[in-house]
Structures are given as structure tokens and as C-alpha cells.
Amino acid sequence: SSVASPDICVITNIGVAHLEFFKTREGIFREKTQMIQDMKNGGTIILNGDDDLLSQTAPIKGVSPIFFGMGDENSFYADHINPLGLKGTACTIYLPDDTSFECVVPLPGIHMVSNALAGAAVGCTLGLTPEEIKAGIEGLPSIAGRNNIIKTDRLIILDDCYNANPVSMKASIDVLDMAIGRKVAVLGDMGELGEHTGELHKEVGEYAAKKGIDL
């Protein structure tokens, strides 16, 4: 980030990926927020207000963060959330100027609504209109390895295999749970979890079992 000197800094969450190197979520928080220290003067900070650590972030370099999240205490938030299974999620998105619009986030999973809110915050910062932001959200393409739905004659495959961590793995299981029919989870290893590797893999397995995944 010191090379890029960003104009806009966005942090979507403080999970447990890279615990092997940073030991605690607080350590991950310190590392992720370092890019804000490298931000250009007068830049914009956009943070997930639903994250327990990010929501407590005080002004940095004299800049107060803009928060997005599901609750209406955030500057950018969503309600009337209606999951549409693997087709995505319908919702109403609210902007800071009391503007709102209905849209469908075309990628499955409630967590994708949060990501769309982050995008809306960036769009507003860059001067996009609500109509342009809505069009951008509804035109989101899927990419290989990230919540990508692949349909065959017999199967529907949810390809969410890139660089998984416990938070993303649980979100993917939630999406699988929305599907109709027999549900099979093929889960790989989660790396860089350090001394917490065993317990976190067990936690994800128990989560899948609780959700009623068939295999």
C-alpha cells in the first residue's frame, strides 16, 4: 500500500485468515489498517460497520470512516432482504442522502449484499449516480473460484474454492444450504491458520453438519 498510496481504502471484514502470521484478529486488524496510514491526504476510508473491530475504528489521519452494513446505523445499509436461492438476493439499498433503490445482487449469499454495499460506497465516493450503482450491482459477473455457479446436465456446482478461510467457508456452506436437492460439500484445507488449524477445521465441519448438508 505504501507503493500505491491509495485514494480510497476499503476493508470488508477482519476474519481469521492469516492467523499463522498475525496470531490474533487484532493483529490482522493492525495489518489491514496499515494501508490507511499509507493513504493519500484527503482520501476516503470505507469500512464494514457490522464487523466488531472495524466498527470501533476512530478517525485516522483526520479522516472519519464511512461505514456500510446491514444495520441502519451505517451510512450505507440494506433492508427488505429476500434471498432468491442460487439466483442471488433481492434487497433495498440506502445511501447517505436518503436515496434508496431496490435491486437484485446476482451472486448468491447474504454476504454478497454486504459486498454490494461496499461497492455502493465506493461508487458514491467516485460520483456515480444511484442508477449507475444499481446497474453495476445487478450486472455483477461471477468469476472462477469465487461463488461461481456451474450448471451441468445432472449437477449444479458451487465453485468457491479459491483461498478459503473459516468465514468464507461458512458463507459458502450457507449458500449450499439454499440449494434444492441433495447437497454435497467438498471442502479442502484452509491454510495459514497456525495453532488454530485443527479447531477451526473442526468448527467448519460442525457448522456443515448443523446445516444439514447431506455429505
Range-by-range predicted roles:
Residues 5-157, 181, 206-215:
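Acidic, Mg2+-coordinating active-site environments of NTP-dependent enzymes
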Residues 143-145, 161, 165-215:
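Active-site beta-alpha connecting loops in nucleotide-dependent enzymes
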